[in-house]
């Protein structure tokens, strides 16, 4: 996720420097070297998540943490934009620093969560409609699509801390990648071949 977030942010903002933290020193150093070469900007690896967050305009939490927050509220400064990949990446103290939240979509898997050992069950207090594991949740939080369409406001001022809550993914990227793969097979005349290279479906350990 971090390796896709970095070029995405650089595509829409004039990023001058990226700071990265990972609990694995080798991974964060490799990420810094690779992204610096790819993006042509300074990328530095740091020894603590607070150092990475402090003084940063855009904070992207791209981890595999299902049960523990990865940033602290004390490190978040006024005017910061925050995004997450997993819901537990921001704890109560970090959420308390947020002034304005926009979420991905109104759908949540209320009865199909993945919990790590010892994690308490979800306390779902918002009103919901629907049946089974997929329900429509109305908690009053604006949607990203509504902000893009001009139906909801964006940032109110330069000091406002804003948060994009990735409450549930849509998986559209998988459909897009599938289309690219299919087009490639058609160009090679391989449509109908059922075996694809295994490396297309694997990745290295996360950063």
Regions found by a protein language model. Give the residues of each.
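Conserved active-site and cofactor/substrate-binding residues in soluble primary-metabolism enzymes
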Residues: 23-26, 30, 54, 77, ...
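NAD(P)-binding Rossmann-fold cofactor-contacting core
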Residues: 11-36
